């Protein structure tokens, strides 16, 4: 039985992870749940259902949790509850392990606040099932430095899970993320697929008056609001490009993004001999989540497979870089300095929050990110303090640029 700590348990990744765990009794023991605090009743119900001994809440809501627990679980002993800005990182570091045997920390937090828990999990020696792409985008080399053993990170993003699996067709040299990742000399390029979001084929003029409800209507994936907006602007794909470069030690110039509206082929690896290995499955996050929890093993019957005996069509096309400049901004950021990706991410977080609150227009999101990125001078050390300083600068600059 594998010990699991789940961060972001009330979010999209977290709830689906608990679906996987519930569907495979006897294989996992949930040792801790962490959440921001926006859905205390759900968190208490999760803790009661899975007999969780430890709970971490980013907000100061211990009393609210106790009240919810009493209503849901009655006299059942309440788990240990820690609250505050350090609670999630402390929980993330509570498991230990080695390359031969370890528990798993699934980081399903959204945003750069996931960096400290990511570092804590790596330093503890636990396997890190990483859905919090922002950790890699802003943390860069700090992540590699914090790893306790080779292969400690298992990607949970569907694209990076696909790449890790496809890279297994290489020579199985050791790589940063998994026991299978590699064959660097054999790889010509990585191909990240994007659905194209709800605005594929639209012009910039078409996007001028886009509303939040329209942007949240993703054609193929069910995700949280921030990730869904990021997917619509394609900045999510820019962040994933940076993540892939770091995870798999591939030059960003050797990573291509293509639009695949069906969202069945989750990414591909093109080898130097001209062959391409792709990972395909219907769009269902339960699958990469399950693989992250059980890696290198596979769980039985996690999701329905592709219906190979049913007529179907897959299409691939280039994205419109003029309408969707976010991927280009990500390339510029990763080429500029080690701290520019942190600025890119922080500026985007501010802008997406403002858009969802109805305070700015849709096109203002990426336009403002571009202006903030251009104004950053790149000075500062690549350290945790340096990353946090760059993050804070970008947030302040974004608020100023938007007049907020």
Task: Describe each region flagged by the PLM.
Residues 1-404:
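Catalytic, metal-anchored helix/loop core of enzyme active sites in primary metabolism
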